[in-house]
Amino acid sequence: MPTPKAFTLLGPTACGKTALALKIAETLPVEIISLDSALLYTGMDIGTAKPSASERAFVPHHLIDIITPVQTYSAARFVEDCTRLTGEITARGKCPLIVGGTMMYFRALTQGLNDLPEADACLRADLDEQKQMYGLDFLYRTLQKVDPETACRLKPNDSQRIGRALEVYYLTGRPMSAHLNGQPEHTLPFELYTAALIPENRARLHENIALRFHLMLEQGFIGEVENLRRRYPGLTADSPAIRCVGYRQAWEHLDGATDRQTFIEKGIAATRQLAKRQLTWLRKTPLDCVADPFSDGTSGTRLIEAAKRFFGE
């Protein structure tokens, strides 16, 4: 049996990945595998710019709406799901098209996973108690002592990742940085072609981000977050689902911490920061083909042709 093939379309938020993926679907018999951690959650449609019902009816989409906002998902599970789906889609005679910008998942898929321990509920409860008693700054200073490399790359207010780094250290006796630096060799079980939309005009990308954020507000984004708060009482601003850009800022606004204008400004700024991080990842990623989505209108055609050649169509 021939080795399965998958075509990956990467790019920062608001650069036109979904629109291009649908154009590819007009040309090739594809099924889309979402590479977007925000699209996993049910009930989070507007703020994630989730593909519409008609778009999902036009071409099959996978790894969308598979967990609730109070459930968790991991890079390890993505690798497992993506690998399985690639084989299943290929067996159906279709072409797997991986689309998104969650670069941590892509790195896990292409470079492999580190042997980090599973979360430990008892240890995490102990760390949460320490945070309540002594403050997050105490945990951050502890991390600086036991794993200065990880502490250096984390923000002092990143409660979730600080807790996870300490958890790894206490469970294994080794700092997380040592685990990450000791990454084993990894071989993909399928052939992968990696294309990316990378805009040279950063101002145009920022304009798209602002326009899309305002459109989300018109579509009822605040109401969507209010519904999440009512439906899932266990959700907090630190929940992984609410850490998605826009949602945390909306959550703070609904808590009364910001007025509407400040919320909008912070939401747009957070989305721009996400795009910046995605572009930084992309510039370090080996790519088979790169196109500027805001250039002359031919970039989409080039990537469609690249996909056709790759799949032998």
UniProtKB/Swiss-Prot annotation:
Keyword Iron assigned: no
Region described as Interaction with substrate tRNA: spans on this chain: 36-39, 160-164, 243-248
Any one Gene Ontology molecular-function term assigned to this protein's record: ATP binding
InterPro entries: Dimethylallyltransferase, IPT, P-loop_NTPase
Catalyzed reactions per annotation: adenosine(37) in tRNA + dimethylallyl diphosphate = N(6)-dimethylallyladenosine(37) in tRNA + diphosphate
Species of provenance: Neisseria gonorrhoeae (strain NCCP11945)
Cofactor: Mg(2+)
Pfam families the UniProt entry points to: IPPT
Site for Interaction with substrate tRNA, residues: 102, 124
Residues that, per the record, bind substrate: 13-18
Record-listed ATP binding positions: 11-18
Protein family according to the UniProt entry: Belongs to the IPP transferase family.
Function: Catalyzes the transfer of a dimethylallyl group onto the adenine at position 37 in tRNAs that read codons beginning with uridine, leading to the formation of N6-(dimethylallyl)adenosine (i(6)A).
Keywords, sorted A to Z: ATP-binding, Magnesium, Nucleotide-binding, Transferase, tRNA processing
Record EC number: 2.5.1.75
Taxonomic placement: Bacteria, Pseudomonadati, Pseudomonadota, Betaproteobacteria, Neisseriales
NCBIfam families: miaA
GO biological process: tRNA modification
Protein name: tRNA dimethylallyltransferase
